Amino acid sequence: MFGMNILDPVAIKEILENGISLPIVVTNMRNPEKTTTIERKTINDNGHPIKIITGKKNCAILRIEDEFVHQLLNSLENKKRYSEFVILSPFTKDGIKFSRILFLDGDYVKRNEKYILGFDPLATITYNRGVITLIGDEMWRVQQIVSKTSAKIGESGLNILNIDAQEETSRIIVVVEDSTDNIEKAITAIHEERSNIKFI
């Protein structure tokens, strides 16, 4: 698993799909002595629910009609062998249901923009997005985790463009504008609030 941009279930889906209990070691590439080990099984029920906070710059969000999204995803995974994306919560506008896909590599999307937009004439892409991901254990048991996290990020002067929390993955994704040091500010803000976030 060397070289992942962000630790996410789409990157380790074979491990998850087969129910394998395998520890994952995340290494700081600038300082390889710094590592974090993530295990599927909770070692200590009283441990902190947030295990790791990651940030990724240069992302893009695709808005596409729901009826075309499966075609696109199948094509990306099977023909392009590309899976560095996360499906965000859908929305409805003017009676049309849209899906949103967060691409973790904005440069890839720019290179393949014509191909991606070719699946739906109403599809649009927004660039310059940054994503902060909170990964942990049973975060659905944590009272006000989303509100506390978003409030702290807001206090640091950042505008949150999207928050996506999924009980099944115990993951929270926060999308902000990718400019100057926004990602670093958001991560710092969450770390400052971490001590106030506890299990119910």
Predicted regions located by residue number:
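C-terminal catalytic "cap/lid" subdomain
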Residues: 1-200
